[in-house]
Amino acid sequence: MSRVGILLLNLGGPEQLEDVRPFLFNLFSDPEIIRLPFPWLQKPLAWFISTMRFQKSQENYKEIGGGSPLRSITEEQALAIQQQLEQKGLLTQMYIGMRYWHPFTEEALTRIKREQVEKLVILPLYPQYSISTSGSSFRLLDKLWEKDSELKKIEYTVIPSWHQRPGYVQAMVELITQQLDQSPNPDQVHIFFSAHGVPVSYVEEAGDPYQAEIEECVDKIMKTLNCSNPHTLAYQSRVGPVEWLKPYTEDAIEELAAGGVKDLLVVPISFVSEHIETLQEIDIEYRELAEEAGISNFYRVPALNTHPVFINDLADLVMEALDAPSRDFSDAIQMKKIIKMYPQERWQWGLTTTAEVWNGRLAMVGFMALLLELITGYGPLHFAGLL
């Protein structure tokens, strides 16, 4: 019988305060998180952002105990899935591949090769597909597979997304129902779905299906819930000056409060494990915001973690994937290429394309010089008294 492995993919998170800065550097070094026209800028910009943000981020992690519980929860999920599969008659080895912190995806692949796995199911712990979550991990795996002859011997299949799985939806409905039942006025509770946001350009220009899958998921949950409570979908955790999917969670909370909502139940729709965005951003920041805005009762649905209905459904999903035709990384990477076409000789401003390329390069050099001067406090702008 073939040796079967299950590779669970997730984001990763700093386990202690000292991990925060390198974790942020890894995160912002990913071109799917911050997309730049020049790849050589990725690492310097990641260093700059992680240097500027890590102290604030450390403060946030202090508020939830000094580190992320994501690794330990993912390990619990892996064990629960393995036990469920064993009950269904399938013996497997479980592996965890985090994108930005230990155990890194590369570490998981080293174990997979060492333990001579012959069949591998790759399961992202993101219900909805996005080029910045599952897609980023799939592209990394694709690159690693291409240059490793040992990996090429492994028969693998990829599960791109599973946002409409019946067990996932049912588990979410059960958790929402439990919270509604604890409210003194369950019919008056406004159900507030909060998903991690992505830049609008990912959806409109790169063809990311994330927003559509989130909306489909919310619609399916509400239909299964079969209640008359009003509901809202909003997006949290945006970074940087570009436009992200709207409405933003903080704006939507204030708008609902201004409209007279007093009971709010927040449902973290794109997260299956407790981590910084549920424990700190929702439980602390958004709770304070809601109370200041006039919301009297703020509730939050817990993350799925090892909910038995959810775990059983993931085990079924693995079994189905093994029986179905295999899907490779190219099938799973759902991103269309957008190519902006310009005249070959001149752009609309009358400049040659070569001149525009050099203008762009010089602009980026100037940008990096400005960043360096802001960080060090030395340079021509300081000398001239402009900074």
UniProtKB/Swiss-Prot annotation:
Named in its record, the pathway it takes part in is: Porphyrin-containing compound metabolism; protoheme biosynthesis; protoheme from protoporphyrin-IX: step 1/1
GO-annotated cellular components = cytoplasm
Keyword list, A-Z: Cytoplasm, Heme biosynthesis, Iron, Lyase, Metal-binding, Porphyrin biosynthesis
> Binding of Fe cation: at which residues?
H196, E277
GO BP of this protein: heme biosynthetic process
Recorded hits in Pfam families, A to Z, give: Ferrochelatase
Q: What Enzyme Commission number(s) apply to this enzyme?
A: 4.98.1.1
- What is catalyzed by this enzyme? heme b + 2 H(+) = protoporphyrin IX + Fe(2+)
* Matching InterPro entries: Ferrochelatase, Ferrochelatase_AS, Ferrochelatase_C, Ferrochelatase_N
Localization recorded for this chain is: Cytoplasm
Q: What is this protein called?
A: Ferrochelatase
